Amino acid sequence: MEPLKFRDVAIEFSLEEWQCLDTIQQNLYRNVMLENYRNLVFLGIVVSKPDLITCLEQEKEPWTRKRHRMVAEPPVICSHFAQDFSPEQNIKDSFQKVTPRRYGKCEHENLQLSKSVDECKVQKGGYNGLNQCLPTTQSKIFQCDKYMKIFHKFSNLNGHKVRHTRKKPFKYKEFGKSFCIFSNLTQHKIICTRVNFYKCEDCGKAFNGSSIFTKHKRIHIGEKSYICEECGKACNQFTNLTTHKIIYTRDKLYKREECSKAFNLSSHITTHTIIHTGENPYKREECDKAFNQSLTLTTHKIIHTREKLNEYKECGKAFNQSSHLTRHKIIHTGEKPYKCEECGKAFNQSSHLTRHKIIHTGEKPYRCEECGKAFRQSSHLTTHKIIHTGEKPYKCEECGKAFNKSSHLTRHKSIHTGEKPYQCEKCGKASNQSSNLTEHKNIHTEEKPYKCEECGKAFNQFSNLTTHKRIHTGEKPYKCEECGKAFNQSSILTTHKRIHTGEKSYKCEECGKAFYRSSKLTEHKKIHTGEKPYTCEECGKAFNHSSHLATHKVIHTGEKPYQCEECGKAFNQSSHLTRHKRIHTGEKPYQCEKCGKAFNQSSNLTGHKKIHTGEKLYKPKRCNSDFENTSKFSKHKRNYAGEKS
């Protein structure tokens, strides 16, 4: 087979055609041609740079007098022949009696393969005329009328046309699923019947294709044959390397004018365009619900049919993919086959290990163009960008609350259902997320793998370390629109907002007391149960909350990491420092609705309110005095003790 040339992947327009194109179409042409050339260079096919590419790179018009003269006398350009030929008399004579053209310095690589209907410059009949001229031994050319795509087999053209009609003539009667191509139906049957011919001896996972099986084996042996020349990063699949390279090139050739968003793949801009048009071409006939992606429709169908073929007998949970069942089994077995060579930490998924390794390297290749913040994963950057746009596309049908991530919506839904499938074997605590359970387990093991380089403090969660670092940097990215107050955590801002709204969603069934946060309600409940699971090893004192134990431990160490910049006074808790700062600023955020008096602490406001209600909760046993707050009661006790002595 003759090696691929630049002309085989190029496109040619006549001068008249070029002048008919608008600026966007001309730019698209430039981008496509440059991308084709880069792909050939990457594959090691193109050695010399064509003149056309030089013109395009310099943003010049792809027309010179010399080039225009050549196109004005069009050659017959056909991928079935090794050279270009001049037409003589008519097309038949040209193929029977051909004369090679000489272009001087302009090599064959500099010529472009035309892909318009008049590709071979046949005035009558287009491709059909060319097909008639070809010998019977040569393969014929078939073209799609809608998108002008070329095929060398009539069956391929037919298969392609079915995609435009969206018809799915091949139906699987067993489950009622339909396909537009017969080969897709055959492949689906294999999945359903579980015919997996290739089984992995390492983990027992089975595959129905040898190529997929070969790829999978690389996970266990750690083979990474594809290396990035830019940074030396190794990948076990060629597609992963190609995706990785986009980080460095930052080439986003496909731009949407409506929102200025750019993409490096044409398929991505096609998917994105549907957001603006509001088009939902994938429709469910049973419930008339429509979706903008076929994958979303497939997922939705499962809700109706409950098509879950793979059930785990241990817990009764079922899955619609065998790979999901295999992954789920590991939760029960506790198996963690993927181990980090750096620190020895083990994981139940290879992707989790890959993600963990970045902690050691410190690599953050994904940077936000808006604020310069860098991330370890592209998904984290995508999520971060929503902070700038404020977009929240995922809405809860139950209460109308919107989220910027689908995972956050899934997590939120469990509030309505009350489902908590992940339970701690040590203490019985249940969570609605596996990640929460994993983090919770660190309390029992006391493992703290995440260490602050600034002060040496260690944490059992990476998110806690990130939040802690803001103490040193002073960064407070979350600002209240109501009063302008800023916070270093989004959750604290959410809680703070409830001060303005007065919302207290979490109510104690025992005494009716309501709270802003669920954690405060959980903490409060321990007052009724008397439970104190957190014990100090130093003195044996027990607490009903882990944070109270952490605060107590500072008494033994004497550590006071939070220092006031104004007067130098140090505190063992950040909240104490915040409270102290109000002495300097004069800030009094807690105001009495009854008389307007303001306080710098919420506890002082609570005590003050009792003046209006007449409530006196603190009464000494030895005298008739009574007090509305603990501080006055404590002061009275000290005075009483002094008199006695």
UniProtKB/Swiss-Prot annotation:
Belongs to the krueppel C2H2-type zinc-finger protein family. CDD domains: KRAB_A-box. The keyword Membrane does not apply. This is Zinc finger protein 681. GO terms for molecular function: DNA-binding transcription factor activity, RNA polymerase II-specific; RNA polymerase II cis-regulatory region sequence-specific DNA binding; zinc ion binding. The keyword Transcription regulation applies. It comes from Homo sapiens (Human). May be involved in transcriptional regulation. It comes from the Eukaryota. One of its GO terms (cellular component) is nucleus. One of its GO terms (biological process) is regulation of transcription by RNA polymerase II. A zinc finger (C2H2-type) spans 142-164, 198-220, 226-248, 254-276, 282-304, 310-332, 338-360, 366-388, 394-416, 422-444, 450-472, 478-500, 506-528, 534-556, 562-584, 590-612. Residues 4-75 form the KRAB domain. Keywords: DNA-binding, Metal-binding, Nucleus, Repeat, Transcription, Transcription regulation, Zinc, Zinc-finger. Residues 626-645 are annotated as: Disordered. It holds the Pfam family zf-H2C2_2. It is found in: Nucleus.
